[in-house]
Amino acid sequence: MALVQERKQELVTKYKRHEKDTGSPEVQVALLTERIAYLTEHFKTHKKDHHSRRGLLKLVGQRRRLLDYLRSIDQGRYKTLIDQLGIRK
């Protein structure tokens, strides 16, 4: 399931860097984290859904790449974001 539009807007509002920001690494990572959390809950009841599990692994990889990029350009923003989202390093 895709994110509900209201929840998506909340995340964009919370993590945006300026007024019209929707594509900064912080916003993208927050949206991916929300989708990953949803799929993780989905797999607790649908253990054999291997097709969606592959999608989850792609999302995790994409989030990891964005976090690596953010860490390379600004260590402080990276640390703040992983603390706010509760992501392991």
From Swiss-Prot:
Molecular function, one GO term: rRNA binding
Role description: One of the primary rRNA binding proteins, it binds directly to 16S rRNA where it helps nucleate assembly of the platform of the 30S subunit by binding and bridging several RNA helices of the 16S rRNA. Forms an intersubunit bridge (bridge B4) with the 23S rRNA of the 50S subunit in the ribosome.
UniProt xrefs under SUPFAM superfamilies: S15/NS1 RNA-binding domain
This protein's name: Small ribosomal subunit protein uS15
Domain of life of the native organism: Bacteria
Any single GO BP term: translation
Any one GO cellular component localisation term in the record: cytosolic small ribosomal subunit
CDD domains: Ribosomal_S15p_S13e
Record's subunit section: Part of the 30S ribosomal subunit. Forms a bridge to the 50S subunit in the 70S ribosome, contacting the 23S rRNA.
Family named by the database record: Belongs to the universal ribosomal protein uS15 family.
Pfam families xref list: Ribosomal_S15
UniProt cross-references to SMART domains, sorted A to Z: Ribosomal_S15 (SM01387)
Species of provenance: Anaeromyxobacter sp. (strain Fw109-5)
Record keywords, A-Z: Ribonucleoprotein, Ribosomal protein, RNA-binding, rRNA-binding
Gene field: rpsO
